[in-house]
Amino acid sequence: MKNLEQYTRYPKGKSEKKLSGRLGLYWDESIQDWELIVSDSKRISEFLKVYQTELKDDDDKFTLMGLIVSSFDDGINKADAEMLELWEICKTILKKECFLHFSIIEYWSFLEEKDIENVFSITLYIREVWNDVRLNFEC
């Protein structure tokens, strides 16, 4: 494997604050794991639309994608056809922008865990993304 540190990113407070204002979400500078706290599976379509039409800054895109994936994790167990269609859009973005979203893909894939009873609800879906992009990160 290549040195993967170069692809490691973390959400930026500045982006969290900006996105909170844009999306009407709670934000406080003392919050850790903002994307987990404010996730909302009912708003995935809105989040994806903002991602696709309004964002140019990589920090903002990374931070919003973290919120989107966390929101999928909240709702994927009771997914209907609409949510699965939204997942296909998200999956396409993750694959296309895999270098930007490497940290999100790696975290939610939970690759070291083999027992599917001990993974996130979204893990099996994200592992499909990982399987499609991992060659980009191998020697």
Where are these regions (language model features)?
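Alpha-helical solenoid scaffolds in large eukaryotic transport, assembly, and signaling factors
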Residues: 2-3, 7, 14-96, 104-113
